[in-house]
């Protein structure tokens, strides 16, 4: 259970990071 929660947290973090990576170049 804890491992799955950690994986989900990492996934959400990766998703937000990818969104920022897509938004930053366009905004800049």
Curated annotation (Swiss-Prot):
EC number(s) per entry: 3.5.1.76
Reaction catalysis annotation: an N-acetylarylalkylamine + H2O = an aralkylamine + acetate
Protein role: Shows a strict specificity for N-acetyl arylalkylamines but not acetanilide derivatives.
Keyword set, alphabetical order: Hydrolase
GO molecular function: arylalkyl acylamidase activity
Binding partners and assembly: Homotetramer.
Phylogenetic classification of the source organism: Bacteria, Pseudomonadati, Pseudomonadota, Gammaproteobacteria, Pseudomonadales
This protein's name: Arylalkyl acylamidase
Regulation: Activated by divalent metal ions. Inhibited by certain thiol reagents.
